[in-house]
Swiss-Prot record:
Organism: Fusarium vanettenii (strain ATCC MYA-4622 / CBS 123669 / FGSC 9596 / NRRL 45880 / 77-13-4)
Gene Ontology cellular-component annotations: transcription factor TFIIA complex
Name under which the protein is recorded: Transcription initiation factor IIA subunit 2
Quaternary structure (record): TFIIA is a heterodimer composed of the large toa1 and the small toa2 subunits.
InterPro entries xref list: TFIIA_a-hlx, TFIIA_b-brl, TFIIA_gsu, TFIIA_gsu_C, TFIIA_gsu_N
Amino acid sequence: MATGAQSFYELYRRSSIGLALTDTLDDLISDERINPQLAMKILGNFDQAITEALQKNVKARLQFKGSLDTYRFCDEVWTFLIKNVTFKMDTGGQAVTANKVKIVSCNAKKPEGT
């Protein structure tokens, strides 16, 4: 994978797979099997790979409806806090509800210089 000058957001590091990778890298650093610089490079590759994989492979659509509580736009990132949300997949099935949902929306690639 060519990383070039592009950088990707680190959003997916907080997903279950991202946390598992981070924990594993921490263990390898603690055991002195890799250095921290290599771990950071691996995480950078993960950021790019997960972004591109989701962009390419996810085809399902989701609709949601709720009450917008708060929104903000900072550093090219939108954040929405929504209450009483109902989710419906385009494949049918049962609707899912949640009391509160936080949605973070940004470009797949970070703008240059951030």
